[in-house]
From Swiss-Prot:
InterPro entries, sorted: Znf_C2H2_sf (IPR036236), Znf_C2H2_type (IPR013087)
Subcellular location: Nucleus
GO biological process, one term: regulation of DNA-templated transcription
Expression induction: By heat stress.
Species, as recorded: Arabidopsis thaliana (Mouse-ear cress)
GO terms for MF: DNA-binding transcription factor activity; zinc ion binding
Protein function: Probable transcription factor that may be involved in stress responses.
Source species taxonomy: Eukaryota, Viridiplantae, Streptophyta, Embryophyta, Tracheophyta
SMART domains linked to this entry: ZnF_C2H2
Name this protein carries in UniProt: Zinc finger protein ZAT8
Gene name for this UniProt entry: ZAT8
Length: 164
């Protein structure tokens, strides 16, 4: 009988020790120590990895803008990465694919059955969309004179009925 009570006592002690260890989860070994993240470029220290990531982005800025060879290589990279996304229906260009996706909703006919796509045949062949580019901000503006096109649009062909 004595052996049985000693065995229960050992199990209880072991369980208590495990619970004590589990209650310390999340504490650093020395107590109040915090983890520090250091920038490899300038050795500045940050309290979180996210803050370090934001700081590291600042090192990607142009260091010496007066070096012409460096500017030439950067402009070549910019033209390769800055792709435009033209609308396959009307030809308007967008800087981001997400903007093109939002624009494509305009080509969905609300009066026809849902999902009917208005195609290039909706516009006459002589219609051109003029795209102007602002040099200061890089945004593009499309100019389209809809009043002059009203008599040229073939509503019957596209929608299957005449709209008055």
């Amino acid at each position: 009988m004595v052996a049985r009570s000693e065995e229960v006592e050992i199990v209880e002690d072991t369980a208590a020790k495990c619970l004590m260890l589990l209650s310390r989860v999340g504490e650093c070994g020395g107590g109040g120590e915090k983890r520090v993240f250091r920038c490899k470029t300038c050795l500045k220290e940050f309290s979180s990895f996210q803050a370090l990531g934001g700081h590291r982005a600042s090192h990607k800025k142009l260091i010496n803008s007066s070096d012409p060879s460096l500017l030439g290589s950067l402009s070549n990279k910019k033209t390769k990465t800055a792709t435009s996304h033209p609308c396959p229906i009307c030809g308007v260009e967008f800087p981001m694919g997400q903007a093109l996706g939002g624009h494509m909703r305009r080509h969905r006919s609300e009066k026809a059955s849902p999902g009917t796509l208005v195609t290039r045949s909706f516009l006459p062949e002589t219609t051109t969309v003029t795209t102007l580019k602002k040099s200061s901000s890089g945004k593009r503006v499309a100019c389209l004179d809809l009043d002059s096109m009203e008599s040229l649009v073939n509503w019957k062909l596209e929608l299957g009925r005449t709209i008055s």
